[in-house]
Design a protein with these regions (language model features):
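Bacterial N-terminal signal peptides that target proteins for export
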Residues: 1-9
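C-terminal motif of bacterial Sec signal peptides marking the signal peptidase cleavage site
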Residues: 18-21
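Beta-sheet-dominated interaction scaffolds and their linkers
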Residues: 27-62
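Short beta-strand and strand-turn-strand segments in soluble, beta-rich domains
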Residues: 84-106
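Short proline/glycine- and polar residue-rich coil/turn motifs
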Residues: 107-114
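Short glycine/proline/serine/threonine-rich loop/turn segments at secondary-structure transition edges
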Residues: 126-135
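Beta-sandwich strand segments
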Residues: 144-156
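Conserved small/polar residues in nucleotide/adenosyl-binding loops
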Residues: 161-163
Length: 163
């Protein structure tokens, strides 16, 4: 009986301390950071290339409204594709630069949460590229150093399907 009371008291004490232990937690440790909007739900998307080519979009966002203009940049990163290939057990090659058009620099204006979507145009694949599997692995980086970029949602892969 004595042990039951002690156990109940200790259990109640543990329960009460568990509910009150985090009253002073600081949840604002990340601050403002940049990320790829599409990467929040998926790390990649498939893009079908026809005889006319293909179009895609990618969007740079901030976790909070910008207090001043923020300059970011999308860069093609082969390491992103290496990790993607490893996770997907695939063997995509980086899409050659002459096969796509993209404005890599974006600006999120003061007071805004996101930049206008960056448009990517993929040209029809030249004959010498047909038969290989290509992807466009993108990483978001800070162009002016004013806002850090998250490591988890800063990359996005466009895997290309040629028909």
């Amino acid at each position: 009986m004595k042990n039951s009371i002690k156990t109940a008291v200790l259990g109640l004490a543990a329960l009460v301390s568990g509910f009150s232990a985090c009253n002073d937690a600081d949840y604002d440790t990340l601050g403002v950071h940049a990320f790829v909007s599409e990467s929040a739900s998926n790390k990649s998307t498939k893009v079908t290339i026809t005889e006319l080519g293909a179009d895609a979009e990618i969007t740079a966002c901030l976790s909070e409204a910008a207090t001043k203009d923020v300059k970011l940049k999308f860069v093609v990163d082969s390491e992103v594709l290496d990790r993607y290939n490893q996770k997907q057990a695939s063997s995509f090659l980086v899409l050659p630069e002459e096969v796509y058009e993209m404005d890599s620099e974006v600006t999120i204006k003061a007071g805004e949460f996101s930049a206008p979507a960056t448009k990517i145009h993929i040209k029809p694949l030249p004959k010498e590229y047909v038969g290989e599997s290509y992807a466009l692995p993108l990483r978001l980086v800070s162009a002016d150093g004013s806002v850090p970029v998250t490591s988890v949602t800063s990359t996005y892969v466009l895997s290309l399907i040629h028909i």
